Amino acid sequence: MTKDELKKKIGQRIIELRTQKGWSQSDLARACNKDRQAVEKLENGKVNPTLYTLYEISKALGVSLERLVE
């Protein structure tokens, strides 16, 4: 798997988990202290998230880091 494929896969997983909670991008952004545009870029695979960003997102979504990136 390439780096770009991995970023897109993680982005799709974030979308899936976020929508399961009934959250908008703004809701997730508030919960993990990011702005909506940052969440949008993550979900679209436009940026390479840091481990800490992934941790914050998993914590906000109430899932393990492992589940977020599986």
Q: Where do the PLM segments sit?
A:
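Conserved hydrophobic/aromatic packing and binding residues within compact polymer-binding modules
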Residues: 14, 28-29, 39-42, 68
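DNA major-groove recognition helix of helix-turn-helix/homeodomain DNA-binding modules
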Residues: 50-67
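Short basic helix-loop element that most often maps to the first helix and adjoining turn
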Residues: 12-31, 56
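Recognition helix of helix-turn-helix/homeodomain-like DNA-binding domains
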Residues: 33-47
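Short, conserved catalytic or interaction motifs in soluble domains
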Residues: 44, 63, 70
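Short amphipathic helical patch at the helix-1/turn junction of helix-turn-helix
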Residues: 8, 19-20, 48
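A detector for short, charged/polar N-terminal pre-domain segments
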Residues: 1-9
